[in-house]
């Protein structure tokens, strides 16, 4: 036991009166009583566990398990900082169950406790004359520890969570970019952890008066957690090579913070897929039976050679007006409804066909041996549709409010949508590729068309918070702000209480691969929707988001692709090298 308690202030006032008052108000005196009463172990990890017992505070793992913690090699553990001191003890106890080579970079006040001195690397959070040298030594020690293959626990905010007026919530302030330096230099794995905790109202009110008052009350916040259970969520380990794709240390800090806070969103009510039992009545009407294959084959056989866009093995790609293939259109509608229901969308009808199908072209992939509709797309020639039915003849106009100004911004355009691949062929890459090749070959035959546009769906298989995140990231990184001024949603996406992120935190997610990893971790499965990814690969830009009540509240993004600005190599992948060369030369200005 230390001769001088770490919870007693140096006596500078007469009889120590002032210090005693501060100790009582702040809660230091109660911590001192606990510290003096019990014979704590000198072992740092045992001490951490004993402190939790004496404070009558528990922690439980709500997501992940200690088995997810890498057992060797340099590891940086990043966490939010909601409580101010207790989380350091909790994480030391938690990580200590798996690794003994642990250091915690935290407030130096904790490192003054003898039993924690060997475990904590103290940082001076006050801007004093000595803080620069103290913190420089701390950073060097942290780097050295990682270079030796150890675990470093860091709270990158550097101070306890507080009211952030810009975000209108209690949360961490911006994370220090120094966390990026630790990761980049050590090439360590990173384990994000989210700690679900909150301090008293008095604590936050005091902080709004002056940060020092908040600091003064931190010991009291340790004590008032008695009888409470703090939940901890462990994320998936993030490899250094993933973080190496980010531009700088600030981007790394933002990326890690996003992945950490998403652990909270992933376990609350906003995380569940919309596609659930509540939608069973929506699908009360069964999907129609498959159309007789003989009828389909007869229709395809009667098509002209000019209707065939391309063929590959037993697969052929056609594009024809709907009135020429009534049976095939019924089968396409059946396949649409079957597939869209599987991801929480669908019209709820026996077949997904509508009044727009009659005036649109149907592009489809045909399996000539099995007589199957493999996949399909719907194409609308914008000017022709407007001539026939006005602007309301465009399907996208039922979802988004726009006028001729938006359409004129795209020159000659084709509205595309209702993309689908039949269930039996969804594990193959070829069908979707052939659909895109079909569109490209159609454009090559009709090279005046420069733009594709239409709704791309984010299905209800994605949780609400994932849908919000997709919309937010796309708005920051893949958005045409000028065209967006010309479009309004008919049913806007409602804001969520879980949109903790700010736009600058999302700016590094323009890399589709990185963002897909974030989504995959959040959803424990799918990354970016495959069709959206395809559009982005063609430099597609979103201009608006809308919820479609007639399609089981699917979230649609209105996307625009300028084919004339797609690079020749990418365009050649779909259109063919020579076709792409001619097309690009035609549209060069």
Predicted regions mapped to residue ranges:
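Membrane-anchoring hydrophobic helices of lipid-metabolizing enzymes
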Residues: 1-81, 88-90, 97-101, 117-118, ...
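Non-catalytic C-terminal accessory region of glycerolipid acyltransferases
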Residues: 2, 136-288, 501-509
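Short acidic (Asp/Glu) patches
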Residues: 62, 72, 76-78, 84-91, ...
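Carboxylate/His-rich catalytic cores and anion/metal-binding grooves
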Residues: 99-106, 360, 366-392
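Conserved nucleotide-cofactor-binding alpha/beta core module
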Residues: 103-134, 139, 146
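Conserved N-terminal entry element of GNAT/NAT acetyltransferase domains
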Residues: 281-323
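Short amphipathic alpha-helix that is part of the acyltransferase structural core
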Residues: 309-366, 372-375
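Acyl-donor binding region in acyl/amide transferases
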Residues: 337, 347-350, 384-541, 546-556, ...
């Amino acid at each position: 036991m230390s001769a001088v308690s770490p919870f007693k202030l140096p006596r500078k006032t007469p009889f120590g009166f002032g210090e005693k008052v501060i100790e009582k108000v702040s809660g230091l005196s109660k911590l001192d009583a606990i510290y003096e009463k019990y014979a704590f172990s000198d072992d740092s990890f045992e001490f951490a566990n004993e402190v939790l017992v004496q404070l009558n505070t528990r922690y439980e793992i709500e997501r992940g398990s200690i088995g997810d913690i890498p057992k060797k090699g340099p590891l940086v553990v990043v966490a939010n900082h909601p409580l101010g001191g207790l989380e350091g003890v909790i994480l030391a106890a938690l990580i200590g169950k798996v690794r003994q080579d642990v250091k915690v970079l935290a407030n130096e006040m904790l490192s003054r406790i003898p039993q924690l001195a060997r475990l904590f690397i103290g940082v001076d959070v006050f801007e004093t004359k000595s803080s620069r040298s103290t913190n420089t030594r701390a950073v060097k020690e942290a780097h050295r520890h990682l270079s030796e293959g150890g675990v470093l626990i860091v709270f990158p905010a550097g101070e306890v969570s507080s009211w952030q007026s810009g975000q209108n919530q209690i949360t961490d302030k911006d994370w220090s970019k120094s966390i990026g330096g630790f990761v980049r230099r050590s090439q360590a794995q990173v384990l994000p952890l989210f700690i679900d905790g909150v301090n008293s109202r008095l604590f936050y009110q005091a902080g709004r008066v002056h940060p020092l008052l908040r600091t003064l009350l931190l010991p009291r916040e340790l004590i008032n957690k008695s009888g409470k259970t703090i939940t901890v969520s462990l994320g998936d380990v993030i490899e250094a090579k993933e973080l190496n794709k980010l531009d700088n240390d600030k981007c790394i800090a933002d990326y890690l913070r996003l992945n950490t806070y998403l652990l909270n969103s992933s376990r609350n009510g906003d995380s569940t897929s919309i596609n659930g039992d509540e939608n069973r009545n929506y699908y009360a009407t069964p999907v129609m039976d498959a159309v007789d294959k003989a009828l389909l084959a007869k229709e395809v056989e009667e098509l002209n050679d000019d209707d065939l866009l391309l063929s590959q093995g037993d697969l052929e790609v056609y594009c024809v007006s709907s009135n020429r293939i009534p049976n095939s259109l019924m089968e396409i509608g059946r396949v649409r409804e079957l597939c869209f229901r599987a991801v929480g969308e669908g019209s709820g009808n026996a077949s997904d066909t509508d009044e727009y199908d009659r005036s649109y072209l149907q592009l489809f992939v045909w399996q000539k041996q099995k007589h199957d509709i493999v996949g399909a797309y719907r194409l609308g020639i914008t000017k022709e549709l407007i001539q026939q039915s006005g602007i309301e003849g465009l399907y996208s106009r039922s979802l988004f409010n726009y006028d001729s100004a938006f359409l004129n911004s795209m020159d000659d355009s084709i509205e595309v949508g209702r993309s689908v691949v039949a269930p039996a062929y969804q594990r193959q890459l070829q069908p979707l590729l052939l659909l895109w090749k079909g569109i490209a070959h159609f454009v090559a035959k009709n090279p005046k068309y420069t733009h594709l546009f239409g709704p791309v769906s984010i299905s209800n298989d994605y949780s609400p918070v994932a849908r919000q995140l997709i919309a937010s990231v796309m708005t920051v990184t893949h958005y045409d702000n000028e065209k967006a001024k010309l479009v309004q949603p008919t049913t806007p996406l409602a804001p969520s209480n879980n949109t903790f992120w700010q736009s600058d935190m999302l700016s590094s997610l323009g890399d589709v691969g990185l963002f897909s990893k974030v989504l995959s971790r959040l959803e424990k499965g799918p990354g970016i929707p495959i069709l959206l990814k395809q559009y982005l690969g063609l430099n597609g830009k979103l201009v608006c988001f809308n919820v479609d009540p007639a399609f089981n509240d699917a979230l649609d993004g209105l996307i625009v692709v300028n084919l004339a600005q797609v690079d020749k190599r990418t365009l050649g992948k779909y259109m063919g090298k020579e076709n792409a060369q001619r097309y690009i030369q035609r549209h060069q200005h």
